[in-house]
Amino acid sequence: MVGGGGKRRPGGEGPQCEKTTDVKKSKFCEADVSSDLRKEVENHYKLSLPEDFYHFWKFCEELDPEKPSDSLSASLGLQLVGPYDILAGKHKTKKKSTGLNFNLHWRFYYDPPEFQTIIIGDNKTQYHMGYFRDSPDEFPVYVGINEAKKNCIIVPNGDNVFAAVKLFLTKKLREITDKKKINLLKNIDEKLTEAARELGYSLEQRTVKMKQRDKKVVTKTFHGAGLVVPVDKNDVGYRELPETDADLKRICKTIVEAASDEERLKAFAPIQEMMTFVQFANDECDYGMGLELGMDLFCYGSHYFHKVAGQLLPLAYNLLKRNLFAEIIEEHLANRSQENIDQLAA
C-alpha cells in the first residue's frame, strides 16, 4: 500500500526516551506533533516519515519558537523545507495550495524518486539533504546529500537528520576562524548532540543499519547511492548491464556531443540494444536491469535521454510495485528544471 507505514525492523532502531539500562523498560518516544499534522504531511507526500523528522522539528522549535524552519539559517545557512513546510503551515498561506505538487516540491534536477528533500543549504551549489528510501512503503535508509549544480552524486550522511546536521556542523567548525561564530556553532553542537543522545539517535556517518543495506545493493549506479531490488535465491531480480559504468558514460557523451541528428541516431544504437536486453530481463523478472539503465540515463542529465528514461523508469518502478516512484519520475521528467523547484514560491 502506497503511503502506508513502513514496518520498523526489530532491533532497537527507534530512539529511546528513558535513560535506563533496562532495554525492556525503555519506551519508544514519540515527538509531540499531533496525529492530524502527521497525517497531513503523509497525505501530501504519500510517504511515511521517520520519527527523527518530527523530533528534529521540535528541536528547531526550541532554538527558534517563532520560525523553526529558519532556526539554523543564521548559524549554518540551512533551512528546513519540503515536508517541514507543511509542519510550518506554509502550504496554507499559498493561494493555490490545492494544485500544489508535493512530488516536485524541492525536487532538484538530479533527485531520483527515492530522494525526498528536507533541508537546503548553499544556493550556489544547490546543496540539499534528503531522506533516501528504497521503496515508497518503507522508511528511509539514510539521509543523503547532493549538490545539484555540481553533479548527480548522493553522499550518505547518517541514518537520521540529527546525524546529517551534526556532520555538516562539524565540517563547518573546521572551516571557520571567527571566534564569535565558533562559539555560536559550538553552542548548537552541544544542544544537538545532547538531544540526539537523549533520544537515542546515532550520530555516525555510516551506521550498522546502513552497512547492512550496502550488502543488499545490486549496483551503485551513476548517483552512487546504489539500487536495492528483491533478488531471490535463484538470483532472479537483477542482471547486469552489458556495459560498464565508464563505457555507458562514454556512449552518453558521444550521443550528447554528436554534431548532427544523424550522428546522434547512430550513437544511440548501443542504448537501443540495451533496451532490447531490458525487455528480455523484464520478461524473466529481472526488473533491476531496466531500473539501472533508466536511472543512469536520468543521472547523466541530458534532455536527449529524457524520452528513454521516461520509457524505462516508470515501467521498472511499476514492475517492482513502487508505483509512487513511477508517478514521481513521470512528473519530474515532464517538469525537470534546474530552478523553480520551490512549489510554494509565488
UniProtKB/Swiss-Prot annotation:
Q: What is the effect of changing residue 280 to A?
A: Promotes auto-ADP-ribosylation of PARP1
Name the reported effect of residue 239 to A.
Answer: Strongly reduced serine ADP-ribosylation by PARP1 and PARP2. Decreases PARP1 ability to mediate tyrosine ADP-ribosylation. Promotes auto-ADP-ribosylation of PARP1
Q: What is this protein called?
A: Histone PARylation factor 1
Q: What is the effect of changing residue 307 to S?
A: Promotes auto-ADP-ribosylation of PARP1
Q: Which family does it belong to?
A: Belongs to the HPF1 family.
Q: Give the UniProt record's GO annotations in the biological process aspect.
A: DNA damage response; DNA repair; DNA repair-dependent chromatin remodeling; double-strand break repair; regulation of protein ADP-ribosylation
Compartment annotation: Chromosome; Nucleus
Q: Does the keyword Nucleus apply?
A: yes
* Organism placement in taxonomy: Eukaryota, Metazoa, Chordata, Craniata, Vertebrata
PolyADP-ribosyl aspartic acid found at: 235
Q: Which organism is it from?
A: Homo sapiens
Q: Where is this region: Disordered?
A: 1-23
GO CC terms of this entry: chromatin; nucleus; site of DNA damage
Which consequence is recorded for altering residue 285 to H? Promotes auto-ADP-ribosylation of PARP1
Q: Which residues carry this modification: ADP-ribosyltyrosine?
A: 238
Q: What is the effect of changing residue 283 to H?
A: Promotes auto-ADP-ribosylation of PARP1. Abolished interaction with PARP1
Q: Self-association or partners: how does it assemble?
A: Interacts with PARP1 (via the PARP catalytic domain). Interacts with PARP2 (via the PARP catalytic domain). Interacts with core nucleosomes in a PARP1- and PARP2-dependent manner.
Q: Which GO terms describe its molecular function?
A: chromatin binding; histone binding; poly-ADP-D-ribose binding; protein ADP-ribosyltransferase-substrate adaptor activity
Record-listed ADP-ribosylserine modification sites: 97
- Residues recorded as bearing N6-acetyllysine in the entry: 19, 186, 233
Q: What does this protein do?
A: Cofactor for serine ADP-ribosylation that confers serine specificity on PARP1 and PARP2 and plays a key role in DNA damage response. Initiates the repair of double-strand DNA breaks: recruited to DNA damage sites by PARP1 and PARP2 and switches the amino acid specificity of PARP1 and PARP2 from aspartate or glutamate to serine residues, licensing serine ADP-ribosylation of target proteins. Serine ADP-ribosylation of target proteins, such as histones, promotes decompaction of chromatin and the recruitment of repair factors leading to the reparation of DNA strand breaks.
- What residues bear PolyADP-ribosyl glutamic acid in this entry? 240
PANTHER family documented for this protein:
HISTONE PARYLATION FACTOR 1
